Amino acid sequence: MRHRSAKLLALLLCILLACSVLGGCAQAEQQKYSTSFFDVFDTVTTIIGYADSQETFDRVVGEARQQFVRYHQVFDGYNAYDGVHNLYYVNQNAASGPVPAEPELMTLLAWIRDLQPSLEGRVNVAMGAVLRLWHDAREAGVALPDEAALREAAGHVDMSQVILDEQAGTVYFADPELSLDLGAVAKGYTAERVAQWMLGSEMPSFIISAGGNVRCGQKPLDGRDRWGISIQDPGPADGLPGTGYMDVLYLTNLS
């Protein structure tokens, strides 16, 4: 009996030693992978992550990209998509009566509505009528929109005129001249939603860069405790010596 126990103990020690040499049996070595895609929110989206294999990385990023595409279509105010009651659909129809909206759009609009008292006018997604004039002027190569048209549009930017029925999943514009524009929030909100999903995935160590919106997951698995994010001024500015950057932020699980 003692001889058998000794042999079993020796076998267990050999297994533990082998696991130590190989870096652990339960967890494969994590490698750094990255990819970029260009088809959402009119910008380049890059995801860097640490995964146990290329297959794991591709699987997680594939799902993350599908989520980006979905949010892009739902929050798009310029294009229609078959079967999608997105922002464009709402802007085109909500002045005539309550219209259905995708669940993701309802959630975002309700969140923005509830934040209005604390925002104090700093962010107003109901400025679509004003922003449309600037968009049209830019597309036409005009330096400035018509001032009278801007003043008229500025009278139709009251978020309280956006009536949400969360139970029915509908949106109604009490002001028929009002229009929504999600450009101030859509990319950052989407990056956060995707990041929350990725934190529970097989690859919780990641960083997402989506057109100036950067979201870090758990710390990088290369010995560092934080991700380094360089800040660059698009115009001429004095930066850190020898880098061209204004500053570097070191973050973990933050935007």
Regions found by a protein language model. Give the residues of each.
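Mature catalytic core of soluble alpha/beta enzymes
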Residues: 2-255
